[in-house]
Amino acid sequence: MKTIPKKTIWYPIQFILLIGLIAFLSFYKLDVKYVDPWDEARHGVNAYEMANGGSLIQSTYMRQADYYNLKPPLSMYGIMLGMAIFGNTVFALRFYAALSYVLLALCVGLFAKRYGKLESLLAVAFLAVNTTAFQAHMIRSGDADSLYVLLFTLAMICMMKIRENGRYSYACAFLFALAFLTKSYHAGLIAVIGGLFLLLTGELKKWKAKNWLLFLAAALLPIMLWAAARYRIDGMTFFQKMW
């Protein structure tokens, strides 16, 4: 009978324990802290009204067009998902943000394993002890930041794998679009880093017209579809204020 080496046993156990620790830190008493009266509360109202007879494209506050929260609606869909599962509660408001961080830790840990098991565990451990992320406006808050950081990180992971498989450039572009639909112009950082990477590594020289077409479609089509739908509602008003 074959025995499993101890090193093979310990890595998955330690990895699962670290992910479990992050899940505990993210979700434990998630609904205890008061709701921030600024962004968090407003995002909750936006999502609630969207889910209860409002527009899925235009965010509203007190059933009036909201030009204070000038973000595209993807993060509001995350809050709506929480409300659909857990009802209209504070836990539901923050659920998607906490889940995003757990998924972030899982993805980072699995990606880092290519460099070694110790590196994988250290990467997840760092995310567990990064106290700043557990404070206001991110993991334990109904704000867009946690989802944005997840999408940003996935885009960077895909970018680092482009030289292995060029199709990862399309995934990176699509994640840029999702990040834009979450935090608007914050996603520009992905474009800057990705553009420099493609330029400095010489990957752009390998691209043909088909590659450019697919890349631009992945990056721009989701944004353009949302923008067209939003334009039909209130013209250029939202975009002018957003700018």
Language-model-derived ranges and their functions:
Residues H43-E49, I162, L178, T182, ...:
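Transmembrane-lumen/periplasm boundary regions of multi-pass, lipid-linked membrane glycan transferases
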Residues K2, R114, T153-S169:
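Membrane-interface transmembrane helices that cradle and orient dolichyl/undecaprenyl
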Residues P73-Y77, F86-L103, M138:
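Loop-to-helix entry region of an early transmembrane alpha helix in multi-pass inner-membrane enzymes
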Residues L18, V108-N130:
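Transmembrane-helix signature of polytopic, membrane-embedded enzymes
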Residues C158, Y168-K183:
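Membrane-interface alpha helices of multi-pass inner-membrane proteins
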